[in-house]
Structure formats: structure tokens, C-alpha cells
A protein has these predicted regions:
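Acidic (Asp/Glu)-rich catalytic clusters
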Residues: 26-29, 60-64, 87-91, 110-113, ...
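Active-site mouth loops of central-metabolism enzymes
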Residues: 36-56, 94-103, 145-150
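Glycine/Thr-rich beta-alpha phosphate-binding loop at enzyme active sites
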Residues: 44-52, 58-78, 159-180
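Glycine-enriched alpha-helix->loop->beta-strand junction motifs that scaffold or abut catalytic
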Residues: 66-69, 91-95, 113-119, 140-144, ...
Length: 180
């Protein structure tokens, strides 16, 4: 991304009306819980997962089953994802969460060039409240909600200091990879 920035070739933000991730989770849903259905090709703990299953089909099936939003792993090394999955999974029109290790403004810019409605910011990767706030504000300027992930009370304090509106808890400690 830095090379693309250097030669002034970063992808342009998509000029689309993104469905709101936050609004989808807050919308009345009868007595049913809101479900964020996740698509990932692999994980460090489980290895490969349904490598041949088309992302488009996963999105269709999740939507038909009543998911409110889709979570899409785009990290390439550990989860075998790609940014392209976001476009491939956009047909049902559900809000898409880009799950990746995002810690830089260029990654937020790259997200803005996709149909993602939200992106994941992990406090452990951005332990500076000012940086976390800056990345969140940059995302929101593109109409993208920021989902801020925490593990403990110290992370929660940083998330609150950053102005986070959506906070998710990860039971896995990213320092030790142990589940609490």
C-alpha cells in the first residue's frame, strides 16, 4: 500500500451507499437475536476451513438464514482471506464487516475502496487512543463503522477514550492466544 501511495495509485473510495452495520444491529428484529455470520477460509487454531466453498454461496445462505450482517476475514496469511471476498459477498445487500489486522490509515483507505460497511480495529494492535480515534474517524468519514475489539478492562478504557460506538469482546488473549 505504501508503494501505491508513493506513486499516487491508491484505489479510490467507492462512492456507494453502504448499509449501516450499526443500524442493522440496532434495528427491530422481533424476538430474534441479531446474528453476525462469519466467513473465513482458515484459522491459526483450526487450519483450513471449507476452502472450496464459494463466498457468494456463503453470503446467500447466511442471508436466507436471517443473518443481520456478514463478517468477512480478509487477512491473507493466517486466515487465507482477500479483500476481493467483500465484493463477492455483497450481493445480498447485508452490511459487511472487514476483519483484518488493521493498524494503519492506508488499510482504512483500502477498505473504503470495497463495499465494506464496517472494519475491525483491535485495541491490542493500536494501543494508542489517539491513533485508534484517528483510524475510527477516517473510517467514519467514508461511511464505514468501526468495530473496536477488546479483551480486558484496559482495552475497554482505550476503546471508550477513542470514542468507539461499537465494541466487541474477544475471549482469546492475543498476547498468549489462550481463551479466557
Amino acid at each position: 500500500l505504501r508503494q501505491l501511495e508513493y506513486i499516487n495509485m491508491l484505489p479510490l473510495p467507492l462512492r456507494i451507499e453502504r448499509p449501516s452495520f450499526l443500524n442493522a444491529l440496532c434495528a427491530p428484529n422481533g424476538n430474534r437475536p441479531h446474528v453476525i455470520a462469519e466467513f473465513k477460509r482458515a484459522s491459526p487454531s483450526r487450519g483450513d476451513i471449507l476452502m472450496d466453498f464459494p463466498p457468494e454461496e456463503a453470503a446467500k445462505q447466511y442471508a436466507e438464514a436471517g443473518a443481520s450482517c456478514l463478517s468477512v476475514l480478509t487477512e491473507e496469511t493466517y486466515f487465507k482471506g482477500t479483500l476481493g471476498y467483500l465484493k463477492r459477498m455483497s450481493a445480498p445487500g447485508l452490511p459487511l464487516l472487514r476483519k483484518d489486522f488493521i493498524f494503519d490509515r492506508l488499510q482504512v483507505a483500502a477498505t473504503a475502496a470495497t463495499p465494506a460497511s464496517a472494519l475491525l480495529l483491535i485495541v491490542r494492535l493500536t494501543p494508542d487512543a489517539a491513533l485508534l480515534r484517528s483510524l475510527r474517524e477516517q473510517a467514519e468519514a467514508h461511511g464505514i463503522d468501526a468495530v473496536v475489539e477488546i479483551f480486558d478492562e484496559a482495552d475497554l478504557a482505550l476503546a471508550r477514550d477513542s470514542g468507539a460506538r461499537i465494541i466487541q469482546v474477544n475471549a482469546r488473549d492475543l498476547d498468549t492466544l489462550q481463551v479466557d
